[in-house]
Amino acid sequence: MKTYYEQDANVGLLQGKTVAVIGYGSQGHAQAQNLRDSGVEVVVGVRPGKSFEVAKADGFEVMSVSEAVRTAQVVQMLLPDEQQAHVYKAEVEENLREGQMLLFSHGFNIHFGQINPPSYVDVAMVAPKSPGHLVRRVFQEGNGVPALVAVHQDATGTALHVALAYAKGVGCTRAGVIETTFQEETETDLFGEQAVLCGGVTALVKAGFETLTEGGYRPEIAYFECLHELKLIVDLMYEGGLTNMRHSISDTAEFGDYVTGSRIVTDETKKEMKRVLTEIQQGEFAKKWILENQAGRPTYNAMKKAEQNHQLEKVGEELREMMSWIHAPKELVKK
């Protein structure tokens, strides 16, 4: 595994160049501000709206996506996956010039062929492995978050060096930047989200909650045991792996972990995980998601509404009113 650090990157390669950050959401605001603090010239390309005003208030020169691409030598695409292909076709593609770099923080659109850059531009990825607010906060504290770097197309012969310069400007070489490929980053990211981090965990939490409530236990108690305490366990794993978590819990809980875990996540579960991975690798999920967006998201919207109306959510909303240390915004925001 090749990992790059501060001494392996030269942010000076971006001096005299302009970086266009396309999009000013979670990653956009963090990467743009970190780059600026590293002495890099940054412009923000967004359409008129809330993000336009926020970027302007943050002191950036804000312009249309087309103008930003024409202005910059490095173009970082930080729009949501489902918007990138359309914006690329409408405003980016015709404005690309020989020798420019097209950057991404997720490989979805390149790997699944939704964006096909011309052969005369570099195509690379710098993917911080943390949400935007953490990328920014840790940078301001003098540190950085780990990231992945990949080169899809090296038209100039310097693509990796420029990508590492960008990673250093964002602060990621302070922690370490691991070399990967667009394929590996995309497929593992989608699998992790679907099978473990989002799909797997939410299904497990709901199943546990429903098992307890159907067994006659009060929903409030079920919520505490199946969702609320999950953060305590995840934090222990996050800080020191499974061993640290097991060292920190009671022996009763640890024994229950050993004898029961494999009854919940069975060999059949793992077989299904492999089927999910195959669907991702073969592009079936990507096709499904692209078609879902083209159709106006009927399935997505219906499932989202049903999930939001689950008893677990209603009970949780009430119980969190008891928790003074939780400062959740009334309006949901992407971090």
Curated annotation (Swiss-Prot):
Naturally occurring in which organism (per UniProt): Bacillus anthracis
Gene this chain is encoded by: ilvC2
GO cellular component terms, semicolon-separated: cytosol
SUPFAM superfamilies (UniProt xref): 6-phosphogluconate dehydrogenase C-terminal domain-like (SSF48179), NAD(P)-binding Rossmann-fold domains (SSF51735)
Residues bound to NADP(+): Y24, G25, S26, Q27, R47, S51, D81, E82, Q83, Q84, G132
Any one of the GO BP annotations: L-valine biosynthetic process
Cofactor, how bound (note): Binds 2 magnesium ions per subunit.
Name by which UniProt lists this protein: Ketol-acid reductoisomerase (NADP(+)) 2
Residues annotated as catalytic: H106
Keywords noted in UniProt: Amino-acid biosynthesis, Branched-chain amino acid biosynthesis, Magnesium, Metal-binding, NADP, Oxidoreductase
A Pfam short name: KARI_N
Enzyme Commission code: 1.1.1.86
Family the UniProt entry places it in: Belongs to the ketol-acid reductoisomerase family.
Domain (KARI N-terminal Rossmann): residue spans on this chain: 1-180
Cofactor entry: Mg(2+)
